């Protein structure tokens, strides 16, 4: 069976990153029934209606997974970092720890409320 690019993105990651990303994927997709997962820019993006809400990626320097918020610059949250990004902010995750579910839901709520 041939994997789709979006599924391959998750499958090809080593553990524990694979499990962390898969759990994050499930959490985002279960956030709202209207969430749509799409493959853009060689990464999983999640749309709510026509709005790109967030994406999943791996930090190149450390290999840590993160949740990227598309219009994160409009969100003031101490856990979100911009680094050199102009529009996006990210929430770094520790693949060896349980996902901070309440924090992720809080940030998704803030992102979904943006215009």
Please report, for each region that a protein language model flagged, where it lies by residue:
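Charge-dense, helix-prone N-terminal extensions
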Residues: 1-115
